[in-house]
Amino acid sequence: MIVQWYPGHMQKAKREILELNKYIDLYLILLDARAPLSSRNEQLEVLIKDKPKIYVLNKSDLADETKNHEFAKYFQKNNQVAVCIDSLKGTNVKSILKIAENLLKDKIEEAKQRGRRKIIRFAVLGIPNVGKSTLINKITNSAKARTGDKPGVTRAKQWIKINDYFEMLDTPGILIPKLEDDTVAIKLCAIGSVKEELFDKEFVAKKTIGMIKEEYSHLLKARYSIDFSTLSEEEYLIEIGKKRGCILKEGKIDTLKAATMFLDDLRKGKIGRITLDEVVRR
């Protein structure tokens, strides 16, 4: 399965980033903590390679806590600044400004020496539905940026004043134009970063079950009370349908409904704290 999705507004945003880069002091690269590597857009990062960046692993409350620490160390080992946050609850959000100020302390000090006040300008970048607008709302304590739980809700860019020293630019999320790696595509579909009409939910649900059935078997068993050990992914999905009453009129199991239910449970953390990516060992 290959998801091909790159709407016109996404292409426009990419061009605008190139134009805006000369005005931006620092970028917040928002990643989904459940898939920190899969939710990176390294094609985008090439465009802004000359600017400081903070990798913000959002939705860390839904991700495996142990792996949150592992990924934070992974970025640090690669000389990249990373912080795990929960933008909804505000966990660690305040630390972002402190980190930004530290990264740009030389520019700030230089401005002070000249008798000026340095305005630090951010751009928030990330794939759809990673929580860009929610983060901005939490930082600014307002709802100036539209928020939603569907990928691509935020469209128009806007400058938002945080305080006398910080301004943030919210830009539309950008997804890799062609997801050639099926595993990456499945993970992004599973966490809700791709519109559901663009992929086969049953296919994604079964593949995702296959990804997590060993490491998180205890969570699956606790949620659905099903012993996975003797079942295939398809059989497991059918059993979920039976348990949850996903029955069609003719008595068959509605596997599409079961798949939808499973993916919803995964995204909302009802199964438990799960991370789909693995730290790359170097």
Label each region the model flagged.
Residues 95, 99, 134, 207, ...:
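Alpha-helical scaffold segments in soluble metabolic enzymes
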Residues 61-125, 144, 246:
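Canonical P-loop GTPase G-domain recognition
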Residues 1-27, 34-43, 47-53, 60, ...:
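Helix-rich effector regions associated with P-loop NTPase G domains
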Residues 115-117, 139, 160-161:
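Solvent-exposed alpha-helices and their adjacent loops that cap or buttress functional pockets
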Residues 121-141, 145, 171:
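Glycine-rich phosphate-binding P-loop
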